[in-house]
Amino acid sequence: MSIYSIVTAPDERLKQKSKPVLECTDQTRKFMHDMLETMYNANGAGLAAVQVGVLQRILVIDIKAHDPVERPKDFYPLFIVNPEIIEQSTELVTANEGCISLPEQRIEVMRPESVKIRYLDYHGKSQELKANDWLARVIQHEYDHLEGKLMVDYLSNLKRDVVLRKLKKLKNNIV
């Protein structure tokens, strides 16, 4: 297993739209496992491939410890390839979010309370998943990464600029 470096804002790769995966191969599955290890290492709930510098439509999610919904034992981790949001609720919920690509930042984001996605699973089989509450939020957050959107994009221009300046300063102090 490999642990990748996390791409952090204001890196321009995070603003690019990811490309579909053409086929789920053994190499794709190994990459997903490496993404999962990287996510665990960073104490994340989800990770999009772009966050490790790969512009492919792949997400990994594991919120087992925080999911209020009782799920089958083998439900997590979720390996999600080429997701599409096919339904979303009209009810919006605001909650505080963090992101491993935006270190030390917490932002209130309003999102649909539930979503339904269509995607390819670990084996490349088409699946649909209806999610609400915390899982829906994590899916939408990670999906945004595939679209080149960050949680700061939900802020006003002024607030977004303040956060991005903080991140740039933080990044310069680390390097």
Curated annotation (Swiss-Prot):
Fe cation binds at C99, H141, H145. It comes from the Bacteria. Binds 1 Fe(2+) ion. Keywords: Hydrolase, Iron, Metal-binding, Protein biosynthesis. The active site is at E142. InterPro entries: Peptide_deformylase, Peptide_deformylase_sf. Its EC number is 3.5.1.88. It catalyses: N-terminal N-formyl-L-methionyl-[peptide] + H2O = N-terminal L-methionyl-[peptide] + formate. Its cofactor is Fe(2+). One of its GO terms (biological process) is translation. GO terms for molecular function: metal ion binding; peptide deformylase activity. It holds the Pfam family Pep_deformylase. Gene3D superfamilies: Peptide deformylase (3.90.45.10). HAMAP family: Pep_deformylase. Removes the formyl group from the N-terminal Met of newly synthesized proteins. Requires at least a dipeptide for an efficient rate of reaction. N-terminal L-methionine is a prerequisite for activity but the enzyme has broad specificity at other positions. PANTHER family: PEPTIDE DEFORMYLASE. Belongs to the polypeptide deformylase family. NCBIfam families: pept_deformyl, PRK00150.1-3. This is Peptide deformylase. It comes from Rickettsia typhi (strain ATCC VR-144 / Wilmington).
